[in-house]
Curated annotation (Swiss-Prot):
Disordered: annotated segments: 1-165, 848-897
Cystine residue pairs: none
A GO molecular function held by the record: phospholipid scramblase activity
Pfam family, one: ATG9
Protein task: Phospholipid scramblase involved in autophagy and cytoplasm to vacuole transport (Cvt) vesicle formation. Cycles between the preautophagosomal structure/phagophore assembly site (PAS) and the cytoplasmic vesicle pool and supplies membrane for the growing autophagosome. Lipid scramblase activity plays a key role in preautophagosomal structure/phagophore assembly by distributing the phospholipids that arrive through atg2 from the cytoplasmic to the luminal leaflet of the bilayer, thereby driving autophagosomal membrane expansion. Required for mitophagy.
First-listed, main subcellular location of the protein, grouped into a coarse class: membrane
Species of provenance: Aspergillus oryzae (strain ATCC 42149 / RIB 40) (Yellow koji mold)
Entry domain remark: Forms a homotrimer with a solvated central pore, which is connected laterally to the cytosol through the cavity within each protomer. Acts as a lipid scramblase that uses its central pore to function: the central pore opens laterally to accommodate lipid headgroups, thereby enabling lipid flipping and redistribution of lipids added to the outer leaflet of atg9-containing vesicles, thereby enabling growth into autophagosomes.
Chain segments annotated as transmembrane: 240-260, 289-309, 543-563, 578-598
Protein name, entry field: Autophagy-related protein 9
Topology feature Cytoplasmic, residues: 1-239, 310-455, 477-542, 599-644, 666-951
Amino acid sequence: MMTSNILSRFLPPNGSPSVYETLRQQDAESNPSDVEERAGLEFEDDRRTQFSDRELEEAMVDAARDGIRSPSPSPSEPFLTQRSPQRTSGTATAKTGGRRRKHSRPRWMHQDPDDGDDDVPPSLLVEGHQDDDEMRSRLPPPPPSHRHPQRELSPAPGPSSRADRARWNTTREQLPLHNDGRGQRPGVIWSLGHPNLASVDPKEKAMWLWANVENLDNFLKDVYTYFLGNGIWSILLNRGLSLLTFAFVVGFSTFLTNCIDYRNFRGSRKMDDILIQQCTKKMSMSSTFLLWLLTVFWIGKAFQYLMDIRRLKHMHDFYYYLLGISDSEIQTISWQEVVSRLMTLRDANPATAGAVSARHRKFMGSQSKQRMDAHDIANRLMRKENYLIALVNKDILDLTLPIPFLRNRQLFSQTLEWNINLCIMDYVFNDQGQVRTLFLKDTHRKALSEGLRRRFIFAGIMNIFVAPFIVVYFLMHYFFRYFNEYKKNPAQIGSRQYTPLAEWKFREFNELWHLFERRVNMSYPFASRYVDQFPKDKTVQVAGFVAFVSGALASVLALVSIIDPELFLGFEITHDRTVLFYLGVFGSVWAFARGLVPEETNVFDPEFALLEVIDFTHYFPNHWKGRLHSDEVRKEFAVLYQMKIVIFLEEILSMIFTPFILWFSLPKCSDRLIDFFREFTVHVDGMGYLCSFAVFDFKKGTNVISQGGTGRRESGRQDLRADYFSTKDGKMLASYYGFLDNYGGNRPANPSSRRQFHPPPAFPTLGSPSAIEMGNIGERLERTQTRHGPAATFMGQQSGLGPGFGAAGFGDHASPAPSILLDPHHQPTASDFRTANRSALYPRFRSSRPVRPITDPIEDDNESPSAEIRRGAVKKSPHTTTGSSGGAIGTSDSNLGESWRMNLIGDELDKDTGEDGENVDEIAGNAGVLGLIQQFQKVSKDNRGRTTVGI
């Protein structure tokens, strides 16, 4: 009875199909190249459509009368089919017994007799038929293994009788519809009259590979990985050294554990006295099995790297010939420049693959590569990472330890992150990197949740078998890597770094890894300074005493050893412990204790140091407001910024506790995980399914708020809905600002836009602690820590809170400057920056300019509907003039789906002016200065309305 209960948790109920069978069936039926079909816009009834015998005969008669000849199969079709087997409809239907789907228009679109006019005639295409023939002549014929007899012999897939096949063969003999080249020897003809692909010009070959890219997500990932690896030679060197490192760790560990007799170590004078002869033959069975297992893994990894050299060579040619970036330049070029050249290549070379069918060419040209600006590239590269960022931000993952005395402690390590990607991401996403449409329907919610729960349990079981080997390897690798550093500088034992959970909390949507790493690395000096500043008087006193005693003993021993080194270094202070041993002990103790004592010249200002940390991390929870100086905030930050040795110990212990988290904690949130992917996934034309927060759609969740009394009466319910559909602590708005900081400014460098030198901050005197309490730190920040980032051209002068947190809306520019790295539908508009006083995030910050104080945290539109309901309307700041770009973030109606809808600055200004009771038309009626300003504003509004669209 107990066995049946245990098995029932892993096996599906009787009579119900497995959720994996449903997922595989849906993946097989879906067309990965048709993004619109994956959005659920395809007819289900049309999938069962099949050509009848009468329709086939009529088609043959029409073809004979019109003299139509179907083009021969493209030489590249087997190549494309080999890379993506699911695209071959004939193969899929042969396995499933289904019939070919007839792609039709969705139900909500009527049939238009002029639809055929939308297609570009073949004569006007860039490649034309001559280019097709030239491309076919240069490509090798398909190998026999890649031919599809069903495609050649049958006009339509599906079961066919002998009579139908005989009639079809007779028709083919009478009407040569296909030049299949039967009876010829294409291999011999090719080898005699055509060169092979190896002799093709590398630039033309790179262009052909670029034009025939199927999966743009995977291609852009290869481009980005190649950029991070600094070229083909650096990547090959890194892989070779990683293989050598792995072999050295395994070999040296085997030598230390099996080839040395530690019982003879004492008293031995030679290496031969402690070595075990032919130690590999005397190894235990478990050690031998582990060594063979690691050897097979090493050989497989080396073979994988060798096979990947061809792909790296293709990527090298793509960078060198199409982007104009050499291996020496790739180490210094910025990613923004790479994106700019990708967009230039996109515009100069449209997706016109001559060896691709018309339907596939239309897909690639109109959807795939035309949606490839900085925003689209970031969304493709971080399609999965954006979901994980949102999961961590909304606290959906239950990472608590199921241990009685550690239930309130979260554990998130690299091992657990790998298991989450395996259990969740590989479950939700298919092989093409798209979200499975089954997760977007609530009809399979229970089955998907049970399947996810079983995946967690199965992964926990597998971790039990894998954990011992991983623990041993990481222990040896960490020891070999860091022991020498700790020996040279013992103070490094107390060095700190951010935990893996902190990195996912700090990372923003659409922020690539190298940009995030640069931003976080700049915060380390300020984070260490902040942690070391807090009062630890007792610890400092004890550490000072220990440093004094150990330093005195070490100095005396060192002085005596200098006087007579030959005699004194061999002198035993205790039994078998010489002076050299105690010199090392006392020196290490002194270095460690001295590292705990702060410098006497340091000025105590924890609030200033933490603001500098927030400047780069962009992490500022709501409960930190007004408490930056408190010890509670320090403890919470210390959990995110721990010592390296503690992080390593947690990583080792996580291999023991990870199975328990997978068994008990994560299965509890399986329902919420399924609901999250269903409710926070949006479809973007040409891109597929994306996380709703990554598209920066600020109007999601707020359009349902009705205006007037209804919205006020239901404000409580709307607040709950807005909280559910919004990020915490203004994550999406901070990501939006950070993205514009990275990809925004394009104006040429001039003396006014260059980074200016600022003197060191003027710290308050020790005799005036009230200056800190009164908020003078904000004035110092504004005066000394102003930064000019890439987006300073459209954000104005940023505050000392760093990239993404400047005071937008109070600069000299009335509207943000467009970016060459963003397409028109992603360009920032002035309505996106209306009174976006980002410096008002921090209540202790005060600008030198008169601004309206705001004590609320960063909030986007969908994160503050209750405040909008309470106010009833957005009121104009008393310090904002009519010509400024003031307003609330997201007041524009424009978003990614409706980029043509927007509210210009003038509309909001007219509305605000009406609220203030001033009749601008009446004032500007005379032909005076105000009248000219009013006319100028209207002209500017009309011009922006024609050229700028909202994100």
